Amino acid sequence: MTGLKTKILNELSRQWHYYRLPLEKSHPLTLSELRRFGLDRTSQYIYCDYYFRHFLPAEVKKHRQYFIQDQRGFGEDAFHAMWFLLLQELKPKRALEIGVYRGQTITLWKLISRILQFECSVSCISPFSSAGDSVSNYKNEIDYFEDTKKNHLYFNLPMPEVCRCFSTDPQAVEFIKSKKWDL
């Protein structure tokens, strides 16, 4: 019963926050439109959560659900909406992710660019290993590179250009310098 009670209370809280947003919610707003309201960060987050539930394309929602399963990725629903709004507005030609876990962000960028029909060349720098930082714990039994490839295949997306090393390695520094990045 505690789990059900928590879900109900969370949903009531979510609806209350949606109601208090000082904007028109009958149609999706672009990032530029959203900025004109001068919302604080919390309200922007709440709008992204609202956008996820009411306006985000089903394919992007499915992407989120896929990465929630088996802890394939981190973050919250609102982050998928945030990336959608950012890429919709910025339409980056070259995007770089530094530190790939299992490919959630790079597949999301590619998926959104496919949905919005613009070309985005995605690259990444990552050792694709269980080596972590002082706050992260990674599973040793996962081949992170193969898992990232599998996740790209699941969404029928090509693999990005990969620099397979730590971001502090000279090879990574040269890789970053070799291109002009939009994101």
Model-based region annotation:
Residues M1-D70:
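Membrane-proximal basic amphipathic "stem/tether" segments
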Residues Q65-Y66, F74, Q88:
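Generic signal for short, ordered secondary-structure residues
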Residues Q69, H80-L183:
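S-adenosylmethionine/decaboxylated-SAM
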Residues G75-F79:
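N-terminal pre-P-loop "Q-motif" helix
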